Amino acid sequence: MLKIGSHVSMSGKKMLLAASEEAVSYGATTFMIYTGAPQNTRRKPIEELNIEAGRKHMEEHGIKEIIVHAPYIINIGNTTKPETFQLGVDFLRMEIERTEALGVAKQIVLHPGAHVGAGADAGIAQIIKGLNEVLTPEQTVNIALETMAGKGTECGRSFEEIARIIDGVTYNEKLSVCFDTCHTHDAGYDIANDFDGVLNEFDKIVGIDRLQVLHVNDSKNVRGAAKDRHENIGFGHIGYKALHDIVHHPQLEHIPKILETPYVGEEKKDKKPPYKFEIEMLKNGTFDEGLLEKIKGQ
C-alpha cells in the first residue's frame, strides 16, 4: 500500500482525531502534524491531545504511522544567541516526549538549523552539540533531519552537511533523514532528470537506510535557486512525471510520503487544500492540467 498523505491540522478540542479525520477526507494513508503552532512554543498538555480517539479513528481507517514536524522556531545551529540555542534544545526534548505519547509516530522532522552568519562549520558544530544534548539511547522516536534548500544561512543544504551532522552525534542511531524534493532540487540536485543518480549519491554519502520520510513538493524555482518555495504537483520546475516516479520508487516503498504543497485560490479566505486531488493524481499516474481549477471549485 502506498503510504501517502499531507500536512494536516491538529487543532480545536478534537486535536489528533481532527487531524485523522482531515487526512481520511483526502484519501490519505498517513499524515504529518505539528503538535501545536509551528511558529510558537505554546503547547496543550499531552492529556488534551485526544490521543485515544485519534488513534481509534486512525486504526479504523488503516493509518498505522504518522509524522511529527518540529516547529520551525527551533534553531540549534545558532552560535550567537545562547538563549535561542537553549530554547531549541529544551523544546526539542519536549517534542520528543509529546511524540512518544502519541504512540503512532516514529519520526520527528527537524530543519537542522541556521548558522546566522557564523559560517556553516560553526553552525554544524552547534547542531551536533544540540543533538548530543537532546538525544538519549532510551528514546523511541527518531529525529529526521530535513534536506534544506540552502536559503539564507541554512545548514543541511547538501548530503555532505547532513552526513557531517550525523557523524558527529553520539547516539546517531536515533537520527534519520527527511528528503524534501523541493529543497533538494533548489539546492542543486537534478531530481527532475536523474533521481536514481541523486539517490545513489545520497546512499554513498549518507546511507539510504537513513531515509525515512519523503516530503513531496514541486518547486516554483529553477534547480539550484536556493529559494525553497513549494509549488503544486506538476506545476513547477520538477514536474509531474519525476514526482510520480519518486513517489512510486521501489527503494522508497516503505517510506511515508508527505505533501506540503500550497493551498489554491486567489484570495487568502478562498484558498482550498489541494491534497485530495494531488494524492489521487499521484496514485492514478496521469497529470491533470485542469487540477488547479478543480481544487478551486471544490
From Swiss-Prot:
What sort of enzyme, by top EC class, is this? hydrolase
Q: Could you mention a single GO BP entry for this protein? A: base-excision repair
Q: Which SUPFAM superfamilies match?
A: Xylose isomerase-like
Instruction: Return any one Pfam family short name.
Output: AP_endonuc_2
* Gene3D superfamilies, per database record: Divalent-metal-dependent TIM barrel enzymes
Binding-site residues for Zn(2+) 3, renumbered to this chain: H183, D228, H230
> Which family, according to UniProt?
Belongs to the AP endonuclease 2 family.
According to its UniProt entry, what is the function of this protein?
Answer: Endonuclease IV plays a role in DNA repair. It cleaves phosphodiester bonds at apurinic or apyrimidinic (AP) sites, generating a 3'-hydroxyl group and a 5'-terminal sugar phosphate.
Name of the protein in its database record: Probable endonuclease 4
Organism of provenance: Bacillus cytotoxicus (strain DSM 22905 / CIP 110041 / 391-98 / NVH 391-98)
**Gene that specifies this protein:** nfo
